[in-house]
Amino acid sequence: MFRIQLRTMSSKTCKSDYPKEFVSFLNSSHSPYHTVHNIKKHLVSNGFKELSERDSWAGHVAQKGKYFVTRNGSSIIAFAVGGKWEPGNPIAITGAHTDSPALRIKPISKRVSEKYLQVGVETYGGAIWHSWFDKDLGVAGRVFVKDAKTGKSIARLVDLNRPLLKIPTLAIHLDRDVNQKFEFNRETQLLPIGGLQEDKTEAKTEKEINNGEFTSIKTIVQRHHAELLGLIAKELAIDTIEDIEDFELILYDHNASTLGGFNDEFVFSGRLDNLTSCFTSMHGLTLAADTEIDRESGIRLMACFDHEEIGSSSAQGADSNFLPNILERLSILKGDGSDQTKPLFHSAILETSAKSFFLSSDVAHAVHPNYANKYESQHKPLLGGGPVIKINANQRYMTNSPGLVLVKRLAEAAKVPLQLFVVANDSPCGSTIGPILASKTGIRTLDLGNPVLSMHSIRETGGSADLEFQIKLFKEFFERYTSIESEIVV
């Protein structure tokens, strides 16, 4: 008799609610601005209060308090202050980044070719650009709108969550070698179509822009298709497209993020690099924010930066003064919420830096079953196998033995499996925000991250079980770091 043995749920499948919540997070975080907005909502729902860099924090930040601050709407730092915090005490820090490789709409995007309305785009980061062809593309980001009553420019988030644009490939009949080598010009052939030109389109546009007023640069209607502007205006419920002053918009795969695989062991989505770490560090902090906070002598802090994919050198990137400035403010904060005096402050920030630890979290390369020879033979991370500790002798990653011992202890206490990764000697190695912040602050640092396949594709693959593993690890790190940091000193 022929029998079929049904498999039980795979051990690599996560039984928690985190995978479904992560998918929802991904589907509402199509730009760094939306990502930070969603992190803010989660923090506020867990009792965190917003601060501003423009204000003094004296009297506003106190022991047992929970706070967050944003910069540019695309980077965010959140922290919980221990009940026994004093200047000079340690800070447990996790770091991630909010950006991903993408196509960004150019300042003057209006293009027309062969009666097609096209949108000029600029490549951002090092994506696998061929993966963007033949995808239904949505548009999301930040729009500045003029308030008719006050005259102020107001930033609004917009997500045109519909199949709006497409970059079509050339038919195989016209390119017989396409399956041997797919080549294209990123300036002229990585250009999406958005509609068909009508004879009245140009006349309508000229009428709208010919109002006789002086403008320092081309008007918004001269720079972008009125059809695109009209969709933005409708989404934001504003009266006229002329109220749109400028925008920062990126394209994304409209195909929704989802769980997949025989047992939902996979997450199929864009932007896993690095919204994975944003999501897990966010949950790790909020889960630990109130745990024995009365007895906590340190601060528990998470940072999510913009612009990692292009080197981090911006006002809101990891190479900026954003984190150092926050550490500076916290290092002059006395237990009663007032500020320290200058001489004490200088010593305190040095002591805090020496005692603190930074977990730089960015996704890692999972072993690819079809290209296993591309990996170092003894370091092949598996999806569902837990967070990956990344090591590089040339300091592309910051992991060293003291840090590894520390994280190993935390993982064992939290029952979290870990994996190790180094690149093969004949392969290039990427990097993270870890080396940038380690050299900038002198804070001890370790690089780790959850494994993914197809990194920098428009559609990546992660492991659903790894989400809970990393959240548990971060929670353990926040809760226990100050009690064990003195045990591993070099």
Curated annotation (Swiss-Prot):
Segment forming the signal sequence: none
Activity regulation text: The metalloproteases inhibitors EDTA and 1.10-phenanthroline both inhibit the activity, whereas bestatin, an inhibitor of most aminopeptidases, does not affect enzyme activity.
List of residues binding Zn(2+) 2: 273, 309, 456
Record text on cofactor binding: Binds 2 Zn(2+) ions per subunit.
Chief location: cytoplasm
KW ATP-binding (keyword) present: no
Positions that bind substrate: 173, 308, 362, 365, 390, 397
Reaction(s) catalysed (UniProt annotation): Release of an N-terminal aspartate or glutamate from a peptide, with a preference for aspartate
pH dependence: Optimum pH is 7.5-7.9.
EC numbers, comma separated: 3.4.11.21
Cofactor: Zn(2+)
Sites where the protein binds Zn(2+) 1: 97, 273, 308-309, 362
GO molecular function annotation: aminopeptidase activity; metalloaminopeptidase activity; zinc ion binding
Intracellular or extracellular location(s): Cytoplasm; Vacuole lumen
Pfam families: Peptidase_M18
Family matches, as InterPro entries: Peptidase_M18, Peptidase_M18_dom2
Domain of life: Eukaryota
GO biological process, one term: proteolysis
Any one annotated GO CC term: cytoplasm
Keywords: Aminopeptidase, Cytoplasm, Hydrolase, Metal-binding, Metalloprotease, Protease, Vacuole, Zinc
CDD domains: M18_DAP (cd05658)
Subunit-level organization: Tetrahedron-shaped homododecamer built from six homodimers.
Function: Aspartyl aminopeptidase that contributes to peptide degradation both in the cytosol and the vacuole. Cells may respond to environmental conditions by changing the distributions of the cytosolic enzyme to the vacuole when cells need more active vacuolar degradation.
Record's miscellaneous remark: Present with 172 molecules/cell in log phase SD medium.
Family from the record: Belongs to the peptidase M18 family.
Protein name according to UniProt: Aspartyl aminopeptidase 4
